[in-house]
Amino acid sequence: MTARPYEPPPDYFCTHLLKNHQIEWKKPVKAKASPIHLFVFLREPMIEQRWPTTVRNSSIHPHVSSAHPSYRSHSIDAAVNRSSSACFHSPHRPSFPSRGLQKYDYPICGVSPSRHLSYNHFYNQSAAEIEEMLRTRQFPEIAGIYGNDEQPSLRRFTRYNQSINSRAVPPPAPPNPPKMEKHMSHDTSGRGSIFSKSSKKPLFFMGNWTFRDRNKSARPSISEALREERPQSMNLSDIKPATRSKSGEVLGPRNHIHIESITEFPRNIETRVPVKIERSSMVRRKPSNMGGSTEVSITSSSPSPSSSSSTSTGEFKTTITVDDDHQPTAVMRPKKESDTRGTLNNNRYSFQSCVQLRKSCPDLDSTAMSNMEQHRVSKKRTRRAKEKMSQAAWKRKTVKEWSLDDVLLWLQSAQMDDVAGLLIGYDLRGEDLLQWNDQTLAQLGVSNPEIRKKLLDDLSKIIENGPEPAQEDIRNNHRTLFDIVKQTSYDQVLAVETPLTTRDITVTHGRLGCLQITKVNGANLPLKEHDCLLEINERAGEQFKSALMLTKLISDSNGAAIRFVVLRRKTNLVVEESQQKESSSSGISSSPQTPTE
C-alpha cells in the first residue's frame, strides 16, 4: 500500500498560486504507462516567449502558425490539451511591471481550469481535441516514448543545447548557417537518446522536454559549427561580388573599404577580401629588358586641374633601376617620379619588384650562382683551389682557350701572386694574353719592369711549347682484376657471405683501387686484416670510393648477409690455410648468423 502524496485543497491553487508567484506545486497525474510528474511553473516573462495561445497575439510569433515546427517551443505539455479553450483566463490577474514584453494568457502545462483539478484528464479528452492536438504538432502520433526507433523521440530541452531566454526566430534559409548566440554553451550530453536501452521506462523526471525526430538532424550546435578547425580559404566576392564597370572602377561608395564580417563560419578563416583601389585610366609600366624587373605604379590621382598645378612641389625618391639598354643609366640617383602628362604620383600603394644590382665584376654572374655551396665553407674553397693547382688543367689547354681561372692558376704557379691579385676583377680571356706587351702590363698596374719581363718570358715559352699531353688520372684509372691478383703478396681469392654491423670492421681506401680492411673488431668473422674487397654484393669494389659508402650499405642491410669477394694475402701457417680452405670450399662462410660484438 503506497502512501498517497499530499494534495492541496482546491482553494489553495486559486488564492495562493496567483498571489505568490514563487510557489511551485508538484501534482501527480494518472497515465496509462507510468505516473508522470508535471512540473507547474508560474507565468513569468521567461516563459512568456514560448507559447502564446490567444488568437490575437499569435501573429507576433510566426512559429505558431508556420508550417515549420519550432523545436524551441515543443515541450512535454504536448501530451495534454493545448487548444484555445485551455487558456487560463483569470479576471483577477495581477498586473505585472512592464518589461518591454507583451503579456499573454498561457496554459499551466496545457491544463484548462475545468480540468486542472481532475486526476484523469487524459480520459476526459475527446477524439477531436486529440486530433487537433496531433495536427498542430505535425506528428502522426505521440510516439518515441517506448524507445521505438521508427518514431520521433523525446530530447531534453535544457540550457546546454537551447536557450529559452532567446527570442523565437523563424527557421533560417537552408544555404545560410544558423546564427549562434554567444551565451549558448556546448552540448555536453553525450547520449544520443535519453531512453535507456535495457529499460522501457522513459525518464520523464528530469527537466523539460522537446520532440525531436531520430532520423532528422537536430539544430546545429556551436560544437558542430566549430568542428572543422582547419583554416578555410573562401572568396567573399562569391558571396557578395563587387560590381565593376568596364573601365575597372568599383561601383559603390568610395569613402571606405567595405569588408563583410561573417560570424556564421568557423573561427580559423583565411579570407580573401576584394579591396577597392581607385585607379587612373592606365597602369604605368617602366620598360626593361630584364625579366621580372618591371615597376608597376597604381595611382589614385584624380584628373582635376589642380593636380597639374601641383607639379612644382615634387617628391624626390631614390630608386635603383637596372636596364640593359645601351644608354647610360644613373644608378642610386635621386629621381623625380612624374607621369608624361605632368601628374605627380602621390599614391602610397606603389608596388616595386625586387631587382638585382649590377655586378662590379662581369664574370661573377656566371661563377657566383654555380657552386655556391662550395664557396660557403673555407675548407671546401681551399681544397678546390689545391685540386685545381695539382691538376693544372691550364697546362693541357692552349693559351687561347684559357679562362680567368686558368690565368690566375698560371700566375700562382709562376710565383706571381701579386700580379694575380691585380688581375682579379678584370674579364680576362686567353685571347687577351696574346696581345700583352710591356705597355699593357704597365697599364694593368704591374709597375716593376723585372716582373713584367719575367711574365712575358714565361708566357712566350708556354705559347711556343704548346699544351702538355693529357695524362691518365691514376686515382680514377680502372684497374683490372688480373692486375690486382697478379700482386705477389696476395694469393687467395675467397667468396665470403656474412652479416655485419658497422662496428665489426674498419676499412680504408687502399692502393689497389678498392677498400681494404685495416682492423677486424667482431669475433668469429671470416674476414681478416689486409683483405681487399674486390666485390661487394655483386658490385665492383672500385665503386666504393670511401668507407662511408660501405657503412651505409651495412646499415641498409639491417642484419642481412652481405656477399664479399676477398683478395687475401698469403700466410705461413698451414693451419690457417686449411681453415681458410674449409671456409671457402662451399662458397658460404661458416660464421654464425649473428656476430657477437
Swiss-Prot record:
Residues 179-189 have a biased composition (Basic and acidic residues). Residues 165-197, 278-344, 576-597 are annotated as: Disordered. It holds the Pfam family SAM_2. Residues 293-313, 581-597 have a biased composition (Low complexity). It comes from the Eukaryota. Residues 169-178 have a biased composition (Pro residues). CDD domains: SAM_superfamily. Residues 402-465 form the SAM domain. Disulfide bonds: none annotated. InterPro entries: SAM, SAM/pointed_sf. This is Uncharacterized protein C05D10.4. It comes from Caenorhabditis elegans. The lineage of its organism: Eukaryota, Metazoa, Ecdysozoa, Nematoda, Chromadorea.
